Design a protein with these regions (language model features):
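Low-complexity, glycine- and small/polar-enriched segments
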Residues: 1-277
Length: 277
């Protein structure tokens, strides 16, 4: 409308960066979120329009008997509402990275029913570039939208000095990576490239104690995960579910990577259209 903000320049650059490192805390929640949101107004760039959002988080610990860390990272760009953008070229780039490492040693338990070592690492990582709503984007030349997600998660429970007890290593990872045009957004460009990439490296290790373990005690982390319907039912033998473990390692990975055009309005590309995921 008439009161909507207008930005006009030769080259226009928007940048959001967030980083955090909490790699030495027993219980940690490192979170890094970098977001760019455009929900209206007019942007006129005689040259380039560029937006970059980058979020990177590191969490973990070493040489301690118990580690529970939740690491969150996000780099996201969202252009929606009634936004109007006119530019000679456009580059939207979102990046998210997580490095988590939990390397625990012994709890020195007082019984074979107790936890001997526990390493639990949860990772949530999001990298998205999205044009939606009623946005109208006109780019004379090259328009690119990219999203890159990199996750490294390492959880190791090694009860080196414990004579008995169970060790538990858990990795829970959720990854969302997307470069999308959706809603009622209308895009016109000389060429258009949408690129979404995900890389995940997960290492999991739980080592049994020399003396082994008995049925885990109530309230122990091992008992908690054996009782969890999402995980406990997966630990089975030919005789049924498992109620006693010397070492338990659980890896739970859900990852989505998308690049696409799903708008109800027309997307017009004079030259090359490149979608990669």
């Amino acid at each position: 409308g008439a009161d909507a903000p207008v930005i006009s320049a030769g080259n226009i650059t928007l940048q959001a960066t967030a980083s955090v490192d909490q790699a030495s805390l027993l219980l940690a929640l490192p979170t890094a979120r970098a977001q760019i949101r455009i929900n209206g107004g007019q942007i006129d760039a005689a040259g380039s329009f560029a937006a970059t959002a980058s979020g990177n988080a590191a969490g973990g610990l070493t040489l301690l008997p118990l580690g529970v860390v939740v690491t969150n990272a996000e780099g996201s760009i969202a252009i929606g509402g009634d936004t109007r953008i006119d530019a000679a070229s456009m580059a939207l780039s979102a990046q998210s990275g997580v490095t988590a490492a939990i390397l625990t040693e012994s709890l020195a338990p007082d019984s074979s029913a107790a936890d001997a070592a526990v390493a639990i690492s949860t990772v949530n990582s999001t990298a998205t570039t999205r044009i939606d709503g009623n946005a109208q984007i006109t780019v004379a030349g090259v328009a690119t939208m990219s999203a890159e997600n990199t996750v490294t998660n390492r959880a190791e429970a090694t009860p080196d000095t414990a004579a008995f007890g169970a060790s538990l290593a858990v990795s829970v990872v959720r990854i969302d990576t997307a470069a999308e045009i959706a809603g009622d957004a209308r895009v016109q460009a000389g060429s258009l490239g949408l690129d979404a990439r995900t890389a995940a490296d997960i290492t999991l290790r739980a080592a049994a104690t020399e003396g082994g373990a008995t049925a885990p005690a109530e309230g122990s982390k091992t008992q908690q995960y054996l009782d969890d319907p999402a995980y406990g039912q997966q630990a089975t033998t030919s005789e049924g579910t498992v109620s006693v473990v010397g070492a338990l390692a659980i890896s739970d990975l859900v990852s989505s990577t998308r690049a696409g055009v799903d708008s109800t309005a027309q997307t017009t590309v004079a030259g090359a259209l490149d979608l990669q995921a």
